[in-house]
Amino acid sequence: KATEQIKFCSPISGKVKAVMRGERRRILRVEVESDGKMQRVQLVKAGFQPATREEALQLLLNSGLFAFFRQRPYDVVACPIDMPKAVFVSTFSKMPLAADFSFIVKGQEADFKSGIALLEKLAKVYVGISPEQINTPILPLDSAQVSVFSGPNPAGNVGVHINRVSPVNKGEIVWTVGPEVVVMMGRLLRQGMVDFT
Protein backbone atom coordinates (compact mmCIF):
# COMPACT_ATOMS: atom_id res chain seq x y z
CA LYS A 1 0.00 0.00 0.00
CA ALA A 2 3.01 2.29 0.35
CA THR A 3 3.96 1.84 -3.31
CA GLU A 4 0.92 2.22 -5.55
CA GLN A 5 2.83 1.49 -8.78
CA ILE A 6 3.13 -2.21 -7.90
CA LYS A 7 0.27 -4.22 -9.40
CA PHE A 8 -0.75 -7.74 -8.46
CA CYS A 9 -2.28 -9.36 -11.53
CA SER A 10 -4.63 -12.31 -11.64
CA PRO A 11 -3.55 -15.36 -13.65
CA ILE A 12 -7.14 -15.64 -14.97
CA SER A 13 -9.73 -13.20 -16.30
CA GLY A 14 -12.91 -12.72 -14.29
CA LYS A 15 -14.37 -10.87 -11.31
CA VAL A 16 -12.99 -10.45 -7.81
CA LYS A 17 -15.13 -12.71 -5.64
CA ALA A 18 -13.61 -12.09 -2.21
CA VAL A 19 -10.73 -10.38 -0.44
CA MET A 20 -9.58 -12.14 2.73
CA ARG A 21 -7.84 -9.97 5.30
CA GLY A 22 -5.88 -10.88 8.39
CA GLU A 23 -4.45 -8.95 11.30
CA ARG A 24 -4.00 -5.22 10.71
CA ARG A 25 -6.08 -5.57 7.53
CA ARG A 26 -3.23 -7.38 5.80
CA ILE A 27 -4.43 -8.98 2.56
CA LEU A 28 -4.09 -12.74 2.87
CA ARG A 29 -5.89 -13.87 -0.26
CA VAL A 30 -7.85 -12.51 -3.21
CA GLU A 31 -10.31 -14.90 -4.85
CA VAL A 32 -11.12 -14.34 -8.53
CA GLU A 33 -14.07 -16.07 -10.18
CA SER A 34 -13.17 -17.05 -13.74
CA ASP A 35 -15.30 -15.84 -16.62
CA GLY A 36 -14.12 -18.83 -18.68
CA LYS A 37 -12.62 -16.62 -21.41
CA MET A 38 -8.98 -16.36 -20.27
CA GLN A 39 -8.59 -12.91 -21.80
CA ARG A 40 -5.16 -11.30 -21.60
CA VAL A 41 -4.11 -7.69 -22.07
CA GLN A 42 -1.61 -6.84 -24.82
CA LEU A 43 0.88 -4.61 -22.94
CA VAL A 44 3.43 -4.10 -25.71
CA LYS A 45 3.86 -5.41 -29.23
CA ALA A 46 5.39 -8.87 -29.55
CA GLY A 47 9.19 -8.82 -29.66
CA PHE A 48 9.42 -5.56 -27.68
CA GLN A 49 12.87 -4.71 -26.30
CA PRO A 50 13.04 -1.86 -23.76
CA ALA A 51 15.80 0.64 -24.48
CA THR A 52 16.15 2.16 -21.00
CA ARG A 53 15.91 1.18 -17.35
CA GLU A 54 12.73 3.25 -17.03
CA GLU A 55 11.03 1.40 -19.91
CA ALA A 56 12.01 -1.98 -18.47
CA LEU A 57 10.81 -1.03 -14.98
CA GLN A 58 7.52 0.37 -16.29
CA LEU A 59 6.89 -2.81 -18.29
CA LEU A 60 7.47 -4.98 -15.21
CA LEU A 61 5.21 -2.75 -13.10
CA ASN A 62 2.38 -2.72 -15.67
CA SER A 63 2.57 -6.48 -16.18
CA GLY A 64 2.39 -7.30 -12.48
CA LEU A 65 5.66 -9.23 -12.63
CA PHE A 66 7.43 -6.69 -10.43
CA ALA A 67 5.37 -7.97 -7.48
CA PHE A 68 7.55 -11.11 -7.56
CA PHE A 69 10.76 -9.14 -6.86
CA ARG A 70 12.07 -9.32 -3.29
CA GLN A 71 14.39 -6.82 -1.66
CA ARG A 72 17.27 -7.72 0.63
CA PRO A 73 17.85 -7.05 3.42
CA TYR A 74 14.53 -7.94 5.10
CA ASP A 75 13.10 -10.02 2.20
CA VAL A 76 10.19 -7.66 1.48
CA VAL A 77 8.52 -6.78 -1.83
CA ALA A 78 11.02 -4.60 -3.70
CA CYS A 79 10.37 -0.87 -4.04
CA PRO A 80 10.61 0.33 -7.67
CA ILE A 81 11.84 3.75 -6.56
CA ASP A 82 15.00 2.25 -5.03
CA MET A 83 18.13 1.61 -7.08
CA PRO A 84 19.47 -1.86 -6.25
CA LYS A 85 23.15 -2.69 -6.27
CA ALA A 86 22.35 -5.94 -8.12
CA VAL A 87 19.67 -8.46 -9.02
CA PHE A 88 20.21 -12.09 -7.97
CA VAL A 89 18.66 -15.20 -9.52
CA SER A 90 19.25 -18.70 -8.12
CA THR A 91 18.44 -21.41 -10.66
CA PHE A 92 18.50 -24.35 -8.27
CA SER A 93 17.52 -25.49 -4.81
CA LYS A 94 19.13 -28.14 -2.63
CA MET A 95 16.08 -28.41 -0.37
CA PRO A 96 14.48 -31.86 -0.12
CA LEU A 97 11.86 -32.48 -2.84
CA ALA A 98 12.71 -29.20 -4.60
CA ALA A 99 11.78 -28.91 -8.27
CA ASP A 100 14.55 -29.21 -10.88
CA PHE A 101 14.76 -25.90 -12.73
CA SER A 102 16.40 -27.53 -15.76
CA PHE A 103 13.21 -29.58 -16.17
CA ILE A 104 10.94 -26.56 -15.64
CA VAL A 105 12.75 -24.40 -18.21
CA LYS A 106 13.13 -27.14 -20.83
CA GLY A 107 12.09 -25.67 -24.18
CA GLN A 108 11.95 -22.15 -22.71
CA GLU A 109 15.67 -21.39 -22.53
CA ALA A 110 15.38 -18.46 -24.97
CA ASP A 111 12.72 -16.86 -22.75
CA PHE A 112 14.99 -17.31 -19.73
CA LYS A 113 17.89 -15.63 -21.54
CA SER A 114 15.77 -12.69 -22.72
CA GLY A 115 14.38 -12.34 -19.18
CA ILE A 116 17.95 -12.10 -17.86
CA ALA A 117 18.70 -9.46 -20.53
CA LEU A 118 15.66 -7.49 -19.30
CA LEU A 119 16.93 -7.70 -15.71
CA GLU A 120 20.28 -6.34 -16.90
CA LYS A 121 18.49 -3.08 -17.74
CA LEU A 122 17.65 -2.70 -14.03
CA ALA A 123 21.02 -3.49 -12.42
CA LYS A 124 23.99 -5.86 -12.58
CA VAL A 125 22.69 -9.43 -12.70
CA TYR A 126 24.17 -12.40 -10.84
CA VAL A 127 22.92 -15.92 -11.61
CA GLY A 128 23.73 -18.85 -9.34
CA ILE A 129 23.83 -22.31 -10.93
CA SER A 130 24.71 -25.80 -9.75
CA PRO A 131 27.54 -27.86 -11.30
CA GLU A 132 24.91 -30.07 -13.00
CA GLN A 133 23.67 -27.02 -14.97
CA ILE A 134 27.01 -26.09 -16.54
CA ASN A 135 26.39 -27.97 -19.80
CA THR A 136 22.68 -27.15 -20.17
CA PRO A 137 20.98 -24.89 -22.73
CA ILE A 138 20.39 -22.10 -20.16
CA LEU A 139 24.04 -21.15 -20.64
CA PRO A 140 25.78 -19.04 -21.83
CA LEU A 141 24.24 -15.93 -20.31
CA ASP A 142 25.85 -12.87 -21.86
CA SER A 143 23.92 -10.39 -19.70
CA ALA A 144 24.84 -11.82 -16.30
CA GLN A 145 27.70 -12.95 -14.13
CA VAL A 146 27.27 -16.67 -13.55
CA SER A 147 28.58 -18.33 -10.38
CA VAL A 148 28.64 -22.06 -9.65
CA PHE A 149 27.64 -23.23 -6.16
CA SER A 150 27.92 -26.79 -4.92
CA GLY A 151 27.29 -28.57 -1.66
CA PRO A 152 24.30 -29.49 0.47
CA ASN A 153 21.35 -27.27 1.39
CA PRO A 154 21.47 -24.19 1.63
CA ALA A 155 23.85 -24.00 -1.38
CA GLY A 156 20.93 -23.02 -3.64
CA ASN A 157 19.64 -20.33 -1.28
CA VAL A 158 19.87 -16.89 -2.88
CA GLY A 159 20.99 -15.42 0.47
CA VAL A 160 24.11 -17.62 0.34
CA HIS A 161 24.80 -16.39 -3.20
CA ILE A 162 24.47 -12.76 -2.14
CA ASN A 163 26.81 -13.31 0.82
CA ARG A 164 29.48 -15.02 -1.30
CA VAL A 165 29.33 -12.95 -4.52
CA SER A 166 28.36 -9.40 -3.59
CA PRO A 167 27.55 -8.93 0.11
CA VAL A 168 25.07 -6.22 1.04
CA ASN A 169 26.81 -3.42 2.92
CA LYS A 170 25.21 -0.74 5.08
CA GLY A 171 22.86 1.42 3.01
CA GLU A 172 22.80 -0.98 0.03
CA ILE A 173 19.99 -3.15 -1.26
CA VAL A 174 19.74 -5.99 -3.76
CA TRP A 175 16.73 -7.50 -5.47
CA THR A 176 16.07 -11.19 -5.93
CA VAL A 177 13.68 -12.93 -8.28
CA GLY A 178 12.92 -16.58 -8.99
CA PRO A 179 13.99 -18.25 -12.23
CA GLU A 180 10.40 -19.12 -13.17
CA VAL A 181 9.56 -15.40 -13.08
CA VAL A 182 12.56 -14.68 -15.33
CA VAL A 183 11.04 -17.13 -17.85
CA MET A 184 7.70 -15.26 -17.60
CA MET A 185 9.54 -11.97 -18.22
CA GLY A 186 11.11 -13.37 -21.39
CA ARG A 187 7.72 -14.68 -22.49
CA LEU A 188 6.26 -11.20 -21.88
CA LEU A 189 8.83 -9.68 -24.24
CA ARG A 190 8.22 -12.37 -26.88
CA GLN A 191 4.39 -12.31 -26.77
CA GLY A 192 3.74 -8.78 -25.52
CA MET A 193 1.41 -10.08 -22.80
CA VAL A 194 1.69 -11.86 -19.46
CA ASP A 195 1.34 -15.63 -19.56
CA PHE A 196 1.43 -17.37 -16.17
CA THR A 197 1.38 -20.90 -17.65
Residue spans for each PLM region:
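Generic structural motif
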Residues: 3, 8-18
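Buried, small/hydrophobic-residue-enriched core segments of structured protein domains
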Residues: 6, 20-197
